[in-house]
Design a protein with these regions (language model features):
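Acidic, glycine-rich segments within the central catalytic cores of soluble metabolic enzymes
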Residues: 43, 170, 176, 180, ...
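Phosphate-coordination loops involved in phosphoryl transfer and adenosine-cofactor binding
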Residues: 46-48
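A structured beta-alpha segment of the ubiquitous adenosine-cofactor-binding alpha/beta core
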Residues: 52, 98-154
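N-terminal Rossmann-fold NAD(P) dinucleotide-binding loop
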Residues: 60-61
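Glycine-rich phosphate-binding loop and adjoining beta1-alpha1-beta2 segment
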Residues: 69-106
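N-terminal Rossmann-like NAD(P) cofactor-binding subdomain of oxidoreductases
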Residues: 116, 135-191, 205
């Protein structure tokens, strides 16, 4: 087992260096989790899927990255003015953001002004042959642009449309511009870190993982019904679900426990 993980680590490092030397996203990376027990590359289960990624930042980019790593054709639809905001993130190498390339490897990119009727028609043509759409606009924005689920499912009834937001599509709180730190605070996640700022983005990652699971479930369902679905993924709900084991303490005991108390001695090494 140790030799297997050593090969995995070496392979990941080599792949990342090849990506950097060859212009990063122009090269195809083999993710470590796509290796079988013998260290050989697995077949790509999503190579017949087309994904349109309308999202910005980690929240939507991570689910489409997962699909891309396993063979899906992911077309990232970016704004004509600034593109994905990830492109501006620091630190950068030669004017290129590491954050952008870490999240958007193995993806194609197109710049669309979806407010232009002619461009919108071109986008609709992509929808006809697409399988999955991912977006993280604030509720109502997609409808104003004419790219909401109702509109696009009329073009392609098999489309799986994943909407990511802070509290869900029907909660008015999602109309505000909220970020990971807001959700982490409101769900009580900072109790785990005793108020220290999380090094990663727990709410973003939690919602991204729920989105991946929801998309995979919808693909299985579509195989049985030949119909798509609208997936409503909320960051708040996802992080609460992620913390289910810890949050349940309140319901069972009516109190919290000191952060130093290990409730599960058998996993005390974590």
């Amino acid at each position: 087992i140790s030799s297997y993980w050593k090969r995995v680590k070496q392979g990941c490092r080599a792949a990342c260096m090849r990506a950097y030397d060859a212009g990063r996203t122009s090269v195809e990376l083999q993710p470590w989790y796509a290796l079988n027990a013998g260290g050989e590359a697995m077949n790509k289960p999503f190579e017949n899927l087309t994904v349109l990624d309308l999202s910005r930042y980690l929240l939507g980019a991570y689910p489409s990255l997962y699909l891309a790593d396993f063979g899906a054709r992911v077309i990232k639809v970016e704004d004509t003015k600034v593109g994905d905001y990830c492109r501006q993130e620091e630190p950068q190498i030669d004017g290129e953001s590491y954050y952008h390339y870490a999240l958007n490897r193995n993806k194609e990119s197109v710049s669309f002004n979806l407010k232009d009727p002619e461009v919108l028609d071109a986008f609709y043509k992509l929808v006809i042959s697409a399988d999955v759409i991912i977006e993280n606009y604030r509720p109502g924005v997609a409808k104003r642009l004419g790219i909401d689920y109702e509109t696009l499912s009329a073009i392609n009834p098999r489309i799986i449309y994943c909407s990511l937001s802070a509290y869900g599509q029907n909660d008015p709180r999602s109309l505000s511009a909220l970020h990971d730190v807001n959700i982490v605070t409101q769900t009580g996640y900072y109790d785990l870190t005793q108020g220290a700022l999380a090094l990663l983005s727990p709410a973003d990652f939690a919602a991204a993982m729920v989105a991946i699971q929801s998309i995979l479930t919808a693909l299985i369902q579509r195989g049985m019904t030949n119909r798509g679905a609208h997936l409503d993924v909320a960051m708040y709900d996802s992080l609460v679900w992620w913390n289910a084991m810890l949050d349940s303490r309140w319901f069972f005991f009516g109190k919290d426990f000191p952060s130093s108390k290990r409730e599960y001695p058998s996993i005390g090494y974590n």
